[in-house]
């Protein structure tokens, strides 16, 4: 019998579910992930999964938000100026472009939902973070005047397009060239 101190916590269960979902997305592609397989891999019942997320799309959305948050954490902002912000954006874009889960979602039937039909949680999170950082850079004079939220949204569109299209332009723009051109585009837009 498990003692209370050895029983899995609610957070542990949620983490197991997310880890199981991530492995399903990578193994099968996002279009073939089932809630039953997520539950099986997590070692929990389907009702346990349903208590946390209403459907598979919600779990995938939570995973995307987590991966975007991790990319932002792994690419810290090293200054308040435009160049530092652009370096961070380019690094985040590169991390997301190399993320198997993110790319699986972007190449799935769900992609239009995340790209063209609505802004998701992770996109709102990025816009908010970018807007705050752009406002600081505007105060230092390294970013042009303008509505920080609108500018952040445009930066998101530029970076998102780069991430989505990187694979098709790879014969022309390798990873280093892509990063350089993205930085040039962003510096030009924000100057």
Predicted regions mapped to residue ranges:
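Short hydrophobic/aromatic patch on the recognition helix
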Residues: 42-53
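DNA major-groove recognition helix of helix-turn-helix
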Residues: 53, 64, 159
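Short linear capping/connector segments at secondary-structure termini
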Residues: 106-114
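Hydrophobic/aromatic-rich alpha-helical bundle segments in the mid-to-C-terminal region
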Residues: 104, 139-184
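Basic, helix-initiating cap at the start of DNA-binding domains
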Residues: 1-28, 32-41, 57-61, 69-70
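Hydrophobic alpha-helical connector segments
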Residues: 62, 73-100, 115, 152-155, ...
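Amphipathic alpha-helical packing segments from all-alpha helical-bundle domains
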Residues: 113-140, 149-153
């Amino acid at each position: 019998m498990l003692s209370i101190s050895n029983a899995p916590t609610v957070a542990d269960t949620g983490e197991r579910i997310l880890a199981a979902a991530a492995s399903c997305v990578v193994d099968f592609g996002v279009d073939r992930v089932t809630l039953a397989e997520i539950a099986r891999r997590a070692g929990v019942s389907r009702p346990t999964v349903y208590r946390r997320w209403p459907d598979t799309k919600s779990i995938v959305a939570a995973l995307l938000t987590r991966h975007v948050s991790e990319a932002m954490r792994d690419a810290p902002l090293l200054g308040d100026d435009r160049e530092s912000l652009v370096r961070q954006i380019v690094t985040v874009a590169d991390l997301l472009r190399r993320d198997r889960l993110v790319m699986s979602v972007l190449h799935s039937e769900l992609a239009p939902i995340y790209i063209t039909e609505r802004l998701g949680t992770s996109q709102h999170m990025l816009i908010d973070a970018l807007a705050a950082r752009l406002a600081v850079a505007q105060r230092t004079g390294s970013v042009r005047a303008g509505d920080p939220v609108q500018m952040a949204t445009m930066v998101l569109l530029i970076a998102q397009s780069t991430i989505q299209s990187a694979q098709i332009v790879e014969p022309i723009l390798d990873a280093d060239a892509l990063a350089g051109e993205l930085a040039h585009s962003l510096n030009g837009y924000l100057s």
